[in-house]
């Protein structure tokens, strides 16, 4: 990563710790877990952070949870960090369960209830849909190869 990106990540990590957004920060070693998770972000996220121009249009992250499972501490830390660096994050929880706020001290989200609650729905396999779309050729590509 470029030095500017590394400095930006470290500044935002420091701010995340200072704000104590994650429950337990400053107690039981939670701050060490926060540091470890942020400094060990997946390579795809780091590359995206480095290549994205936050001044033009903030990046978007959509998280769909159709189960009763509560978001993990690790995922909560990543979400809080990405929110702090400028990501617009949307949780789509059709069940209406409160399975997101467990590890957040501060209210970092705004809740909107839209329509009826839905249960036992499956998330489509977008990778499969993409491969089917790629296999389909247009009329002209079939004619002209």
What does each model-identified segment do?
Residues 60-71:
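Glycine-rich anion-binding loop/nest that anchors nucleotide
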Residues 66-68, 86, 93-101:
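Short beta-alpha junction loops
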Residues 72-88:
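Histidine-anchored nucleotide/phosphate-binding helix
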Residues 25-62:
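Acidic/polar, low-complexity linker and loop regions
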Residues 1-17, 41, 45, 49, ...:
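Structured N-terminal alpha/beta-domain signature
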Residues 1-34, 110-145:
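Conserved N-terminal ligand/cofactor-binding loop architecture of enzyme catalytic domains
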Residues 101-111:
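Catalytic core of nucleotide-activated saccharide and alditol-phosphate transferases
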């Amino acid at each position: 990563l470029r030095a500017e990106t590394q400095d930006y990540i470290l500044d935002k990590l420091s701010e995340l710790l200072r704000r104590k957004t994650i429950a337990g920060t400053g107690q039981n070693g939670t701050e060490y877990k926060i540091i470890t998770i942020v400094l060990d972000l997946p390579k795809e996220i780091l590359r995206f952070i480095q290549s994205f121009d936050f001044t033009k249009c903030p990046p978007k992250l959509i998280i769909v949870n159709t189960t009763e499972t509560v978001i993990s501490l690790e995922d909560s830390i990543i979400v809080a960090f990405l929110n702090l660096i400028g990501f617009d994050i949307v949780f789509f929880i059709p069940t209406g369960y409160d399975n997101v706020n467990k590890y957040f001290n501060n209210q970092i989200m705004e809740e909107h209830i839209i329509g009826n609650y839905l249960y036992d729905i499956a998330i489509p396999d977008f990778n499969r849909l993409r491969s089917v779309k790629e296999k389909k050729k247009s009329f002209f590509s079939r004619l002209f190869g």
